[in-house]
Amino acid sequence: MSFVPTKVFFTKGVGRHKEYLSSFELALRDAKIEKCNLVTVSSIFPPKCERISVEEGLKHLKPGQITFAVMARNSTNENNRLISASVGVALPADESQYGYLSEHHPYGETAEQSGEYAEDLAATMLATTLGIEFDPNKDWDEREGIYKMSGKIVNSFNITESAEGETGMWTTVISCAVLLP
């Protein structure tokens, strides 16, 4: 069986529980994708793939369904430990070409920091495949302007979840791009 996804939706969640696995399950529930058998895949945003809302995407899911997703995931059982999970997205101006999704799951970064980093990763991967010249040592804001001014990258964004650990509990955060037929 092979297919190229035609739709994608983005979701995120956080879960807390005394058990590690249960904290992950609660994060999946918070993201509303707990009923699926998730298969993580690498980071290509398919050509002509339509972004849909979470609500619309959930209509396409059935309990037990094998569901492909790009997932960033992070967990901690340390009190006050800041964790985040981010999926960055970069889309080409030409919809017949593929884009990139990146996963970033750091400790000690805010949601904003983690999100910008993931978005930068995706945009940089796309820029290198499109032949856009840039200085990798420039900061993200400057490179973002170069990427978009080239006319080859039309959009970049991220979806990010962050949380701080709590005493005696596992905390898990996830961010996902859920790919649908």
UniProtKB/Swiss-Prot annotation:
It is an enzyme of class 4 (lyase). The record marks 42-43 as: Cleavage (non-hydrolytic). The modification Pyruvic acid (Ser) is found at residue 43. Its cofactor is pyruvate. It catalyses: L-arginine + H(+) = agmatine + CO2. GO terms for molecular function: arginine decarboxylase activity. The keyword Glycoprotein does not apply. It holds the Pfam family PvlArgDC. Binds 1 pyruvoyl group covalently per subunit. Its EC number is 4.1.1.19. Keywords: Decarboxylase, Lyase, Pyruvate. GO terms for biological process: arginine catabolic process. Belongs to the PdaD family. HAMAP family: PvlArgDC (MF_01404). NCBIfam families: PRK12398.1, pyruvoyl-dependent arginine decarboxylase. This is Probable pyruvoyl-dependent arginine decarboxylase. It comes from Chlorobaculum tepidum (strain ATCC 49652 / DSM 12025 / NBRC 103806 / TLS) (Chlorobium tepidum). The gene is pdaD.
